[in-house]
Amino acid sequence: ILSRAYSSYRTRTPAPVGVFGPGWKAPFDIRLQIRDEGLILNDSGGRSIHFEPLFPGEISYSRSESLWLARGGVAAQHSSQPLSALWQVLPEDVRLSPHVYLATNSLQGPWWILSWPERVPGADEVLPPEPPAYRVLTGVVDGFGRTLTFHRAAEGDVAGAVTGVTDGAGRCFHLVLTTQAQRAEAFRKQRATSLSSPAGPRSASSSSAFPDTLPAGTEYGADNGIRLEAVWLTHDPAYPDEQPTAPLARYTYTASGELRAVYDRSGTQVR
């Protein structure tokens, strides 16, 4: 949940910028692009892995990347399929849905479940809405059937982004997200407070020092400006009556949306 990786590699078919900013990827930043000419899997390492279109129940293997991509739609795989045993650990509704895609890099798992997040449809939208031309990570299932579930916002400024995670042990985590406009407003308030202090600086920087918006497109992909600010443990079945008083991790960003610093639960800067 808290891990992240950096890659300066720029693919020609990138996924959108993730919640840690340009170049950084979280495990849940995996994304599948569904195009007429094929499928493009953007992994958490920044790569774009291309596959041919899949029929329901079909599995394709990329030898160059040692990765399988599958499409749901069948209850079971043929016994000659190397992934037939691993297929059976998936929930039945996942196996049977032709709208769900799955990826794995090992015959022992885990499976990455690629589906679309729930959202609140528009007032004039025809129901049910058509599946989008992409899939995002909604869960991870290990070889024993234990599931890590990602909860995404259905509406609002951060619609579609991961705001909660439930692990196989039943622990629940809340991800606090901010928009560029919210960070800019917080910067201005902090600046105003420091200027009003006797010990504060005497000159204020212009409002352009922290813009309300970021450029929509970058070399790393489209950027909506949403960033991860903090991760909280909100429920632990082993300690149901205990509530943490500090986040597990906290993150700060520059005015241009780049990751500046990372703090652990003790408040110590670790990056």
Predicted feature locations:
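Surface-exposed recognition patches
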Residues: 1-271
